[in-house]
Swiss-Prot record:
One of its GO terms (biological process) is carbohydrate metabolic process. Optimum pH is 6.3. The keyword Isomerase applies. This is Cellobiose 2-epimerase. Keywords: Isomerase. The gene is ce. Optimum temperature is 80 degrees Celsius. InterPro entries: 6-hairpin_glycosidase_sf, 6hp_glycosidase-like_sf, AGE/CE, Cellobiose_2_epim. Catalyzes the reversible epimerization of cellobiose to 4-O-beta-D-glucopyranosyl-D-mannose (Glc-Man). Can also use lactose, epilactose, mannobiose and cellotriose. Highly specific for oligosaccharides linked by the beta-1,4-glycosidic linkage. Shows preference for lactose. Belongs to the cellobiose 2-epimerase family.
Length: 412
């Protein structure tokens, strides 16, 4: 990176301070004080738009794993005892109620009291379990969590790995028999392979490799990176293809700006964790292409990120919370990789939008969706998909990346 392209210390420190305050005084404070359940344990599955918790709501493995990951990562990075306490609360509930003691892996959904409601074994949820458990091990050294993460990895590789075409069967029943319907939700295309699931397998395997650098895991992680470069990333457009058949033939024309910018930094993180220097230039090229395409096509005049371009070419201009969070990290990452100041300015712009429109200054946390005119939708603050992972992780990543930039400035 050219030193002439680094913003001055004042700008870097100001952004870092704002991000730190948002993380500790809004996001994590909300989750630590407004969402834990003193009756059933763990965390509630729903908080309404009015901020009222619904302790009897069903609980999803994805939300609970994301809560565990967020507080474990916050404790590891910031050292605040409360964050360890919250992570341990999430860990205890997750292991007690989501883990299938008979067949292994984690259930899709349980009741508040822990009774299984949906026993599917979706690879997306298994991946978040690995991601969270390996982070808890990173933060505390807990060996039981690492053993559980490894067991889930083994189950994925045994029952879901496609040794012919690459990638993974995405959904199984409780006993790990493949399911025909692999969709995460009703809005997904009815196709057997998706970018989304494979992105989060890659994310999880990279975190597991940090604490368990095993040869087979390295090979599987490298195969995932190469799958993205070969089939999922489209070099002609700078976007990710979202859905495929079993042979990785495209079955989608939609564009997800949030996933594009998220993948732009997760792919580089994975190749760096793996230490694959020969593969890195190709990943960096794809990463910067994804970031440039997002900047050119997905950014609104106010600096925020539009949601997506649908299958029929319609631009969805709503501002969902998670693409804004991923844009903060992705644009900072693109700046660190390229030295091009327009990426740093894009990160500042999306942060300004977050502070002015996406965060809820009265009720806490962030609005799930905001209209093009700046008005928030009356969506739940916490639900099956809305957790502290995207915005919490974005803040943790930004703090760390800004620290590195400040060190670079001081060393000049």
């Amino acid at each position: 990176m050219s030193t002439e392209t680094i913003p001055d210390v004042r700008r870097l420190r100001a952004l870092q301070a704002e991000v730190h305050e948002e993380l500790t005084e809004n996001i994590l404070k909300f989750w630590a004080t407004r969402t834990h359940d003193p009756v059933h344990g763990g965390f509630v599955g729903r908080v309404g738009p009015d901020g009222r918790p619904h302790p009897e709501a069903p609980r999803g493995a994805i939300l609970n794993a994301r809560i565990l990951w967020t507080f474990a990562a916050a404790y590891r990075q910031l050292g605040t005892p409360l964050y360890r306490e919250m992570a341990e609360r999430a860990y205890r509930y997750f292991v007690r109620h989501f883990v299938d003691a008979e067949h292994g892996g984690v259930y899709w959904m349980v009741a508040a009291d822990g009774r299984p409601l949906d026993t599917r074994k979706h690879v997306y949820a298994q991946s978040f379990a690995i991601y969270a458990l390996s982070e808890w091990h990173r933060a505390t050294g807990g060996e039981a969590a690492l053993a559980l993460a490894r067991s889930i990895y083994d189950l994925i590789e045994t029952h879901c790995a496609d040794r012919v075409h690459g990638g993974y069967v995405e959904a199984c029943d409780r006993a790990w028999r493949p399911l025909e319907d692999a969709r995460l939700s009703a809005k997904d295309a009815p196709e057997p392979r998706s970018m989304n699931t494979h992105l989060h397998v890659l994310e999880a395997y990279a975190n597991l490799y940090r604490v368990w650098p095993e040869t087979e895991l390295a090979a599987r992680l490298q195969a995932l990176i190469e799958l993205f470069l070969r089939a999922i990333y489209h070099p002609a457009t700078g976007h990710l293809i979202l859905f495929f058949d079993e042979r990785w033939r495209p079955r989608s024309r939609a564009v997800s700006f949030g996933h594009d910018i998220e993948a732009s930094w997760l792919l580089l993180e994975a190749v760096d964790v793996l230490g694959q220097a020969t593969l890195r230039p190709r990943v960096q090229q794809a990463s910067l292409h994804l970031a440039r395409a997002t900047l050119a096509e997905g950014r609104a005049p106010d600096g925020s990120l539009y949601y997506e371009i649908g299958e029929q070419g319609h631009l969805d201009t709503d501002r969902h919370w998670w693409p804004q969070a991923e844009a903060l990290v992705g644009f900072l990452n693109a700046y660190q990789e390229s030295g091009e100041v327009l990426f740093y300015e894009a990160a500042e712009d999306v942060w300004r939008y977050i502070r002015e429109r996406q965060r809820d200054t009265r009720g806490g946390e962030w609005f799930a969706r905001v209209r093009d005119d700046g008005a928030p939708y009356p969506d739940d603050k916490v639900d099956f998909w809305k957790g502290p992972y995207h915005n919490g992780r974005a803040c943790l990543e930004a703090i760390q990346r800004l620290r590195h930039l400040l060190e670079h400035v001081r060393s000049r």
